[in-house]
């Protein structure tokens, strides 16, 4: 397994797919990285030469991925919560942030439904 940005990428898959195992690299970014590194998208990871691996690593190092990206996203959310914006309040309360309705659904964000005790007979 080749190690790129601290992540072991699978050997048996094509390079363009294997790169998407790194947090912050999707299919489009993966294709851009390979084009800049001059590596074919169809080659398998196990068939890469060490020079090609190094070229891919250099290109990945120019992009914010893994820990740095996660930290930036968390700091952005924390900043929204500190300034008290609407989005920050929704994050703090654990509700949907992007305008979805919460009357019926939103179970993923709100968590498991808590039963309210009904009237006893």
Swiss-Prot record:
Protein origin, superkingdom: Bacteria
UniProt keyword list: Ribonucleoprotein, Ribosomal protein, RNA-binding, rRNA-binding, tRNA-binding
Composition bias type Basic residues, residue spans: 106-121
Annotated GO CC locations: cytosol; small ribosomal subunit
Pfam families: Ribosomal_S13 (PF00416)
GO biological process: one example: translation
Positions of region (Disordered): 95-121
Transmembrane segments: none
GO MF, one example: structural constituent of ribosome
Function description: Located at the top of the head of the 30S subunit, it contacts several helices of the 16S rRNA. In the 70S ribosome it contacts the 23S rRNA (bridge B1a) and protein L5 of the 50S subunit (bridge B1b), connecting the 2 subunits; these bridges are implicated in subunit movement. Contacts the tRNAs in the A and P-sites.
Family to which this protein belongs: Belongs to the universal ribosomal protein uS13 family.
Assembly information from the UniProt record: Part of the 30S ribosomal subunit. Forms a loose heterodimer with protein S19. Forms two bridges to the 50S subunit in the 70S ribosome.
The protein, known as: Small ribosomal subunit protein uS13
Annotated source species: Streptococcus equi subsp. zooepidemicus (strain MGCS10565)
Lineage: Bacteria, Bacillati, Bacillota, Bacilli, Lactobacillales
